[in-house]
């Protein structure tokens, strides 16, 4: 098991939730944290602890975005007009790796980042290998023709674990997806409850 793969399941155990809704998550069989002290009785969590947990969960969901990147995204969300929590989610879902994952071209956000990094993705017909690339409404994200028969892609497209959300229009046959618009929090198909409002409180405090 790779370090990133192992870290992913470690996050599931630490949070006590199946963050990505995967059938192999260890919390499907045990709902306690990793390590020898994982089964200790949980104590009351402070407001700061709740805020930190919300940040770790949201950041981890998108493939463990670095703190530096996450702060940059939050700063832009806070600078924009409107609700900072909603802005934060809209920016996260506008990342190229997030769109690739939502389009079901790959099975996980971790795989999406690697897939983009390795040059398998086109945006409006041009190759883009930057996972954090900002996809705009109307942009067409597609899998390069020579990459379309990869087992990773074929298995993900056939998976019934998740559906493509309404803010992405999928052409499964052409292996392309149009990013219709940045979504609101309520539209994003998170398997668990995300609390961006607590993330905002964390950085604002």
Swiss-Prot record:
InterPro entries: Ribosomal_uS4, Ribosomal_uS4_bac-type, Ribosomal_uS4_CS, Ribosomal_uS4_N, S4_RNA-bd, S4_RNA-bd_sf. The keyword Ribosomal protein applies. The keyword rRNA-binding applies. GO terms for molecular function: rRNA binding; structural constituent of ribosome. One of its GO terms (cellular component) is small ribosomal subunit. CDD domains: S4 (cd00165). NCBIfam families: PRK05327.1, rpsD_bact. Belongs to the universal ribosomal protein uS4 family. One of the primary rRNA binding proteins, it binds directly to 16S rRNA where it nucleates assembly of the body of the 30S subunit. This is Small ribosomal subunit protein uS4. It comes from Phenylobacterium zucineum (strain HLK1). The gene is rpsD.
């Amino acid at each position: 098991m790779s370090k990133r793969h192992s870290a992913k399941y470690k996050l599931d155990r630490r949070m006590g939730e199946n963050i990505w809704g995967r059938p192999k998550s260890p919390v499907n069989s045990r709902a306690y944290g990793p390590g020898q002290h994982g089964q200790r009785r949980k104590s009351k969590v402070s407001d700061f602890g709740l805020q930190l947990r919300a940040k770790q969960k949201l950041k981890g969901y998108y493939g463990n975005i670095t703190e530096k990147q996450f702060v940059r995204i939050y700063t832009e969300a806070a600078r924009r007009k409107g609700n900072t929590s909603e802005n934060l989610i809209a920016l996260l879902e506008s990342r190229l790796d997030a769109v690739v994952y939502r389009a079901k071209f790959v099975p996980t956000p971790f795989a999406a980042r690697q897939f983009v990094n390795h040059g398998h993705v086109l945006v409006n017909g041009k190759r883009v290998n930057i996972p954090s690339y900002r996809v705009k409404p109307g942009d067409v994200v597609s899998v390069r023709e020579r990459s379309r028969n990869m087992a990773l892609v074929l298995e993900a497209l056939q998976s019934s674990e998740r559906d493509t959300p309404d803010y992405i229009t999928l052409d499964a046959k052409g292996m392309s997806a149009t990013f219709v618009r940045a979504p609101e929090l309520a539209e994003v198909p998170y398997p668990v409850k995300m609390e961006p409002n607590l993330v905002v409180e964390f950085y604002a405090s």
